[in-house]
């Protein structure tokens, strides 16, 4: 089965497990990050798992990520301005998605994976607290917080299957993915918590639309270096990396023209 088919099966499973009529009348449907899903499936293929296990583990990791993202919405400024019932339902939705992944792993009786994911969840939440409370002392610490928020879960998956040589690539790939998302958010809404925090540390106070561009260039350089350390990378993931490089070039032209 090709990677695209595995991705579609996992996304179908996610839709089935997050389907809740009442919640969907009040909240947007959960969003699957296609780049994280591709990276997750790529790791599981590298671990030589069969298709059934790939689908189970990829669905589990994606549900965990959705649960964490959903709970994070409660701290979002726009959510704070919403109704109390929306905030309560958002917490409830996050709990519902969390319960689904516990159920999945319980069915395959993988207690060891539960422990690994619990550590990953703890790391994500600790780094989110430090990020939103702006506890970082410098730009390097901010970038490390974002890397850990984005990559801790998938790195734990890699560690579980003894694929730690992927860690540096995972960090840079998902950091670049997040920077791209933040850039798009900023372009369309003129809002980005990450842009604001990074800009606070800029001594020369760049134009805000230039801040993420600066760090994307640095991340691209690191990603190009670390991809060489992956023994074998599938064509779909390689194409996605190339696409991120191309997106960066296009966005750089947009920034320069703007």
Predicted regions and their residues:
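All-alpha prenyltransferase/terpene-synthase fold signal
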Residues: 1-258
């Amino acid at each position: 089965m090709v990677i695209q088919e595995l991705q579609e099966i996992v996304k179908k499973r996610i839709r089935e497990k997050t389907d809740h009529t009442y919640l969907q009348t009040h909240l947007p449907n959960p969003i699957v990050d296609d780049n994280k899903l591709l990276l997750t499936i790529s790791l599981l293929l590298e671990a030589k798992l069969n298709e059934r296990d790939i689908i189970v583990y990829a669905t589990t990791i994606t549900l965990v990520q959705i649960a964490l993202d959903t709970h994070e919405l409660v701290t979002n400024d726009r959510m704070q301005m919403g109704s109390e019932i929306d905030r309560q339902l958002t917490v409830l939705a996050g709990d519902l998605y969390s319960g689904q992944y516990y159920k999945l792993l319980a069915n395959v009786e993988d207690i060891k994976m539960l422990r690994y994911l619990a550590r990953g969840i703890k790391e994500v939440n600790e780094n989110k607290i430090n990020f939103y409370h702006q506890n970082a002392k410098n730009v390097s610490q901010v970038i490390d917080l974002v890397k850990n928020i984005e990559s801790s879960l998938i790195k734990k998956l890699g560690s579980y299957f003894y694929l730690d040589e992927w860690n540096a690539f995972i960090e840079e790939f998902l950091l670049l993915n997040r920077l791209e998302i933040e850039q798009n958010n900023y372009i369309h809404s003129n809002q980005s918590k990450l842009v604001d925090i990074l800009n606070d540390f800029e001594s020369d106070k760049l134009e805000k639309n230039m801040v993420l561009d600066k760090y994307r260039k640095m991340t691209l350089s690191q990603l190009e270096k670390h991809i060489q350390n992956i023994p074998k990378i599938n064509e779909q993931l390689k194409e996605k990396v190339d696409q991120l490089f191309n997106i960066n070039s296009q966005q750089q032209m947009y920034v320069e023209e703007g």
